[in-house]
């Protein structure tokens, strides 16, 4: 089993944490990143998003893409310890909270930190350190220098 994706991605880290909790063995490839895609990555995920999981080396054409799908696969592969509740209402709520974290929270953090700071620095540009006027909290990004 091979997990692909940049270690700074919160979605990759989510899959890594679930794999660790499930005590799953896997190979890790950090190369796929929005800053540079391996030549063959589009065959694995045509959308070029991370993480991606290749569950079986003997089936290179089968990939699971999206952190929630990967975590659900891990849950079925190794049911214990259970990371999702078994009761229907609690399970539905857990899936909803996961979706809120994946879409709303990740988008806000990405807009405030990853895009203006890490992506700029990785591309050799200065970090864009300014108060974000769209932030409802008036969050300021603190200067990061290497």
What would you call each of these model-derived segments?
Residues 1-130:
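GST-like domain detector, emphasizing the conserved glutathione-binding G-site
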Residues 130-146:
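Amphipathic alpha-helical packing segments from all-alpha helical-bundle domains
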